[in-house]
């Protein structure tokens, strides 16, 4: 792979990773430990490897009509997660709230990586080099997710108890933006 072929993939990886960065800002406003932040970033990175890989494999066989479905599903997942965070911030005590682990972490990672499935479909149709592409997507998304989580964590300190509500609203807003782009 030449440098000229690598540059568009790096740009695409940053574009896909910005989804993870944006929603990680909101997720970072939850009360998270450093270990949880690292785990969330790694999970997002792994999903940004798995989803485009599946998309690239299927892209060789399927039409482009599934791109809109993936985009819609990702938006709905983000909106649902955002409402859940707002709900839990308002109605639950700090002690009873849990960090995103288990299924909620996978739902979050799936939601921010589903757009990479659509990109994988397109890249699969055009025969992009799979290994380099998915590793770039995963690594850059992981770094951007960590950046968003750390920034969100520090912003929560400035926003006080309203930080998680703001984070949930960011997720809802981002999901709505995916559904209804301006």
From Swiss-Prot:
A GO cellular component entry from the record: plasma membrane
Principal location class: membrane
Transmembrane regions: 6-26, 37-57, 71-91, 101-121, 131-151, 162-182
Source species, domain of life: Bacteria
Alphabetized InterPro entries for the sequence: Mntp/YtaF, Put_MntP
Pfam family, one: Mntp
GO molecular function, one term: manganese ion transmembrane transporter activity
Topology of this chain in the membrane: Multi-pass membrane protein
Keyword Signal: no
Entry keywords, A to Z: Cell membrane, Ion transport, Manganese, Membrane, Transmembrane, Transmembrane helix, Transport
Cell compartments where the protein resides: Cell membrane
Protein family per UniProt: Belongs to the MntP (TC 9.B.29) family.
Described function: Probably functions as a manganese efflux pump.
HAMAP family with a match to the protein in the record: MntP_pump
Name of this chain's protein: Putative manganese efflux pump MntP
